[in-house]
């Protein structure tokens, strides 16, 4: 092989540290610039020390991977990963914590391809793939004695450690002050953030001692019966935020269909359990609240649908999203396949109206009291323009591309509002279908989103921000309820009471588990009356 460059291993690792610090860490440098520019007084030495500290720290952690036969493939992979991470951080404002890594591991081909655009391909090619290939055309000279190589590496690490120690001694208070007030900085260092979060995720998901599977609600039973069975639709939205719902005060008419359906109650103070589907969906269907939620426990435990099924309610889950994140694994379910409906499916995704296909037959096959759950594709980004058919393109100009950061704010908001409006159409059509069943069933529909979405506010796009610093756009979600007169009478509900609470009372995903058990009159020890939204508004209290 013809080499274009020749170098010794220790200087080469130091060079890599400089390259990674400069090339892939633009997000943290820009963030630090914003932070420091707002301070009244900043020490010049402190500012100068920042890149020196990062280079020294990266060199310290890079050196152990400078082993012959490992160095080139390891850093080639790191170049590509860092290129992808730096682009998404810079353009979308995302942070690579464990939740983001979980999203990466659980995404499907359709979701992954939605993020592919000319800018990201160009960036990853120039800063990731080409340097990765270039590594193999560099001749690296190693020491002819193993102990000499070990000594050189140890010396390099000691020098790095000495630099870090010296900087800490000189500017400790400055680093503590900036770090304490901006805790997210530690999650912005590339590639440390990706490697650290990935390692933790893999350990917790695959390497910890397996947790015994836990059953829930083995004592579940119905406390009320009716000559007329109940049919309920539970609709799970995707990336819809309360802020853009006209029924919650948004200036645009994004809910023209449900607002005219009659009797729809919109909950204005609803919050999600997480900022990503991988967290929110398992959380809302579990009996754990957001504060104590543990994804590993949830994966090894039954949830809401299991308890309802034990109580004798027929359950069926229809999914037009990636999957149900495990919550429907033990109930009858179907994953919509794009090949099944060429009219409503384009490429590898389908419009949410596809969920209404075959609905009458599915309801007819179920026995007794029935609940169908529908998982919408909703406002899944970044390809918002693919979530609604052309005839539902109400707000224009929209943003017909995946690199949404290159659209104007007007285009992006128009596109997102079109997705909200189209989801509203689907929900309204489900309500219309329930009205057709009123002679045979007491009917009801509950709609809520899994999490919200950022549209460029504060430089953030999409979702998955760490919950403690996530903006309201990612955590404030819509929730709507519609009930037939027969359902209201059967459940002895005071609608004025429910409407009043919906307007002013703060609720969250934590309320879903017990609210569903309560409204279905399921008696079980895992029911918590305090979390039941319906209980205060029933003349006969839930069990």
Language model segments and positions:
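A long, amphipathic alpha-helix that forms part
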Residues: 189, 357-360, 399-443, 481, ...
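Transmembrane and membrane-interface helices of multi-pass
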Residues: 1-187
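Metal-dependent active-site segment of extracytoplasmic phospho-/sulfohydrolases and closely related
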Residues: 233, 419-464, 513-516
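Short beta-strand segments
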Residues: 271, 317-319, 371-378, 417-423, ...
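Active-site-proximal alpha/beta segments of enzymes that process anionic O-linked groups
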Residues: 168-234, 239-400, 476, 508-539
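Catalytic cores of PAPS-dependent sulfotransferases
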Residues: 64-73, 92, 307-317, 362-365, ...
């Amino acid at each position: 092989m013809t080499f274009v460059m020749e170098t010794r291993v220790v200087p080469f690792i130091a060079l890599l540290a400089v390259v990674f610090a400069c090339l892939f860490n633009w997000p943290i440098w820009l963030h630090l610039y914003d932070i420091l520019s707002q301070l009244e007084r900043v020490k010049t030495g402190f500012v100068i020390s920042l890149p020196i500290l990062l280079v020294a720290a990266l060199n310290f952690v890079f050196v152990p991977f400078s082993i012959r036969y490992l160095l080139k493939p390891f850093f080639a992979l790191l170049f590509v990963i860092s290129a992808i991470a730096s682009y998404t951080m810079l353009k979308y404002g995302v942070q690579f914590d464990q939740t983001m890594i979980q999203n990466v591991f659980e995404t499907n081909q359709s979701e992954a391809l939605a993020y592919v655009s000319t800018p990201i391909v160009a960036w990853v090619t120039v800063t990731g793939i080409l340097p990765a290939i270039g590594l193999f055309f560099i001749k690296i000279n190693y020491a002819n004695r193993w102990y000499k190589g070990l000594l050189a590496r140890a010396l390099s690490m000691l020098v790095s450690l000495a630099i870090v120690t010296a900087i800490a001694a000189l500017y400790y208070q400055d680093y503590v002050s900036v770090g304490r007030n901006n805790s997210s900085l530690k999650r912005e260092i590339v590639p440390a953030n990706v490697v650290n979060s990935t390692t933790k995720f893999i350990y917790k998901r695959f390497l910890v001692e397996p947790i015994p599977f836990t059953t829930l609600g083995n004592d579940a039973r119905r406390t009320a019966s009716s000559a007329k069975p109940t049919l309920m639709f539970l609709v799970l939205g995707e990336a819809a935020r309360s802020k853009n719902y006209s029924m919650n005060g948004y200036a645009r008419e994004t809910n023209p269909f449900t607002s005219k359906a009659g009797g729809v109650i919109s909950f204005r103070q609803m919050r999600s359990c997480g900022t990503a589907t991988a967290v929110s969906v398992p959380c809302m269907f579990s009996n754990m609240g957001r504060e104590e939620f543990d994804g590993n426990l949830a994966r090894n435990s039954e949830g809401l649908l299991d308890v309802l099924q034990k109580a004798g309610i027929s359950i069926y889950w229809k999914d037009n999203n990636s999957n149900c994140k495990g919550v429907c694994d033990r109930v009858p379910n179907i994953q919509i396949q794009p090949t099944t409906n060429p009219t409503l499916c384009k490429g590898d995704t389908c419009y949410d109206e596809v969920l209404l296909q075959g609905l009458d037959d599915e309801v007819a096959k179920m026995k007794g009291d029935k609940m169908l759950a529908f998982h919408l594709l909703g406002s899944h980004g970044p390809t918002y323009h693919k979530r609604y058919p052309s005839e539902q393109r109400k707000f224009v100009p929209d943003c017909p591309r995946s690199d949404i950061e290159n659209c104007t704010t007007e285009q992006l908001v128009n596109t997102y509002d079109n997705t909200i409006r189209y989801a509203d159409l689907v929900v309204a059509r489900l309500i219309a279908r329930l009205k057709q069943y009123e002679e045979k069933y007491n009917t009801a529909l509950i709609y809520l989103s899994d999490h919200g979405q950022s549209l460029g506010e504060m430089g953030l796009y999409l979702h998955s921000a760490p919950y403690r610093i996530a903006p309201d756009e990612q955590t404030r979600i819509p929730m709507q309820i519609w009930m037939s007169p027969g359902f209201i009478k059967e459940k002895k509900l005071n609608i004025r009471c429910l409407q009043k609470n919906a307007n002013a009372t703060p609720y969250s995903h934590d309320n879903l588990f017990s609210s569903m058990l309560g409204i279905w009159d399921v008696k079980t020890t895992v029911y918590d009356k305090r979390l039941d939204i319906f209980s205060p508004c029933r003349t006969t209290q839930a069990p």
